[in-house]
């Protein structure tokens, strides 16, 4: 029987996961309805919809995976881990893609590379989304293949009844998977980190110029830049904490029955849940859609609903 602290953290984790699934389900539903009614989505909304869908699945798989492991259904965990690897990789890549898109479209750098990308990024987004899907699929296939080979090797070595050899092989495989996960996770995270930092630097420079021309603190443009910088800072913090939490969790030093494991899971998934909240709050369209959500009104209606006109 789990201890009282463990049960408390399990309850918090499940409620957090359900809230995050509801939040991301709202994003997918609103953007999906807009695409169905208007037959189009902006490039940024395409990335947000893909990111929300991957996070919805990630929270669901994480909740199922942790509950199965805590209930001693260990045979099902390796299969659930395959889905978790897929949706976690998609979440990292779509987060990086969204940060790179905003960096290219909003930043004011005069370098020729940024000028070239600014004109072509919108047309490249569908290809980048397909490329992210292919990369994540290859990552999952290679990871699943490695796990299968490790399982077969472990079974063959156990027949020799040499526990020391089995332990060494297991330790070497764990080190390999840790380094492999660290490598494949680091690529999208570095893209996200560089894009977000560059965008923050660009906005700070623009804000400094604007304050020189309009010294008033209540200027609407100045307030808009300040709010954008705050949301970017929160996004940077939450996504960085999620990435670091993944590394700590890959070390597998916490037992599933230990209540600290569940506390750690609450912390990990709270970061991406809060980042999804930032995405909703910084989008006027989604904020207005949230207010009118109970009515389920058509996104192609009047501009008062916040979706604007649907162009053919």
UniProtKB/Swiss-Prot annotation:
GO molecular function: bitter taste receptor activity; G protein-coupled receptor activity
Intracellular or extracellular location(s): Membrane
Residues bearing carbohydrate: 162
SUPFAM superfamilies associated with the record: Family A G protein-coupled receptor-like (SSF81321)
Chief location of this protein within or outside the cell: membrane
GO cellular component: plasma membrane
Superkingdom assignment: Eukaryota
Sequence ranges on the Extracellular membrane side: 1-4, 63-81, 151-182, 255-258
Membrane topology: Multi-pass membrane protein
Residues annotated as transmembrane: 5-27, 40-62, 82-104, 128-150, 183-205, 232-254, 259-281
Topological region Cytoplasmic: 28-39, 105-127, 206-231, 282-312
Extent of the signal sequence: none
UniProt keywords, alphabetically: G-protein coupled receptor, Glycoprotein, Membrane, Receptor, Sensory transduction, Taste, Transducer, Transmembrane, Transmembrane helix
A Pfam family: TAS2R
InterPro entries recorded: TAS2R
Statement: the UniProt record of this protein carries the keyword Membrane: yes
Miscellaneous notes: Most taste cells may be activated by a limited number of bitter compounds; individual taste cells can discriminate among bitter stimuli.
Family: Belongs to the G-protein coupled receptor T2R family.
Role this protein plays: Receptor that may play a role in the perception of bitterness and is gustducin-linked. May play a role in sensing the chemical composition of the gastrointestinal content. The activity of this receptor may stimulate alpha gustducin, mediate PLC-beta-2 activation and lead to the gating of TRPM5.
Name of the protein described by the UniProt record: Taste receptor type 2 member 62
């Amino acid at each position: 029987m789990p201890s009282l602290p463990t049960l408390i953290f399990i309850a918090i984790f499940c409620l957090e996961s359900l809230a995050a699934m509801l939040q991301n389900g709202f994003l997918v539903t609103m953007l999906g309805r807009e695409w169905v009614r208007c037959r189009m989505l902006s490039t940024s909304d395409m990335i947000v919809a893909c990111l929300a869908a991957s996070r919805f699945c990630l929270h669901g798989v994480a909740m199922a995976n942790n509950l199965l492991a805590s209930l001693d259904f260990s045979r099902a965990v390796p299969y659930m881990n395959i889905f978790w690897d897929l949706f976690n990789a998609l979440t990292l890549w779509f987060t990086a893609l969204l940060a790179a898109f905003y960096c290219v479209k909003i930043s004011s750098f005069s370098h020729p590379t940024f000028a070239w990308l600014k004109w072509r990024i919108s047309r490249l987004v569908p290809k980048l989304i397909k490329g992210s899907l292919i990369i994540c699929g290859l990552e999952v296939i290679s990871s699943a293949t490695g796990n299968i080979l490790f399982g077969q090797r472990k079974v063959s070595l156990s027949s020799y009844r040499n526990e020391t050899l089995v332990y060494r092989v297991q330790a070497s495989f764990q080190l390999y998977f840790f380094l492999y996960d660290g490598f494949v996770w680091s690529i999208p995270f570095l893209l996200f980190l560089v894009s977000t930092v560059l965008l923050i630097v660009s906005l700070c420079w623009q804000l400094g110029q604007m304050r020189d021309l309009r010294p008033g603190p209540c200027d609407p443009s100045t307030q808009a830049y300040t709010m954008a910088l705050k949301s970017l800072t929160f996004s940077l913090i939450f996504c960085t904490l999620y990435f670091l939490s993944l590394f700590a969790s890959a070390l597998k030093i916490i037992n599933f029955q230990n209540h600290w494991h569940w506390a750690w899971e609450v912390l990990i998934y709270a970061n991406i849940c809060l980042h999804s909240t930032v995405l909703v709050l910084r989008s006027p369209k989604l904020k207005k859609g949230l207010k009118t959500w109970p009515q389920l009104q058509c996104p192609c209606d009047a501009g008062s609903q916040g979706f604007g006109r649907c162009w053919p």
